[in-house]
A protein has these predicted regions:
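Positively charged n-region of N-terminal signal peptides that target proteins for export
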Residues: 1-4
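C-terminal motif of bacterial Sec signal peptides marking the signal peptidase cleavage site
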Residues: 12-15
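Primary mode marks residue(s) on the alpha4-beta5-alpha5 output face of response regulator receiver
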Residues: 22-204
């Protein structure tokens, strides 16, 4: 019986010393294929991430072939702060996991063209982004943003409408916790849906 108590005590100590939460991040360099697949695919919920296609960047190398029509890749146009060692963390990479319509929107956005879509597009960004001016596309620095309109987002879902005018009259207030419009009045207007911990970067 004493031996049994000893085993139980050791098991309890071991469980107390174990990590409280394991996010599944692989050990090793952030330039590894394994780390990149983990970092980019976890921008979406598990039920999408596990069967999504993964690239190492827009127009980049295929890291994993998927089967569900969703694609995940890093979307930070600023690039890596330390290219030799890869993205510092998934937040810096700003990965997005989107459907086909979302990537039609993205392709137009980065070349300054009007998106042409067959239907609304959707994308998850559960690692958030590094900050945007909520009123003006392609503003990459807080210093260049309109006063009071800079938002560094935490986890969120986005909806890119086929018809941006359908969002007219919807709030642009990103502080309420409710869905809001980013880039209102432009061809790139879209809806941001905050989820748990959306404001964690604004409090740091």
């Amino acid at each position: 019986m004493k031996y049994l108590y000893t085993i139980l005590a050791l098991a309890l100590i071991t469980s107390c010393n174990a990590p409280m939460q394991d996010n599944g991040e692989p050990e090793g360099p952030h330039t590894s294929i394994e780390w990149q697949i983990w970092a980019y695919s976890t921008a979406a919920p598990d039920y999408i991430a596990e069967n999504a296609t993964v690239f190492d960047g827009p127009g980049g190398n295929l890291l994993r072939e998927g089967t569900n029509g969703w694609t995940c890749l890093p979307a930070n146009p600023r690039g890596m702060s330390d290219p030799e060692n890869g993205w510092i963390d998934p937040h810096e990479a700003m990965p997005a996991c989107g459907d086909g319509e979302f990537f039609k929107w993205v392709g137009a956005y980065f070349v300054g063209e009007t998106p042409v879509m067959e239907k609304d597009g959707f994308a998850w960004m559960l690692h958030g982004d590094m900050g945007e001016d909520n009123t003006t596309p392609m503003v990459m620095n807080k210093e260049d943003a309109a006063p009071g309109h800079w938002i560094e987002s935490g986890p969120h879902l986005m909806m890119m409408p086929k018809d941006p005018s359908s969002l007219e009259g919807m709030t642009t207030d990103f502080n309420s916790g409710a869905p809001y419009v980013m880039f209102a009045g432009t061809p790139y207007a879209h809806v941001m849906y905050p989820v748990q911990d959306y404001y964690k970067h604004t409090k740091e």
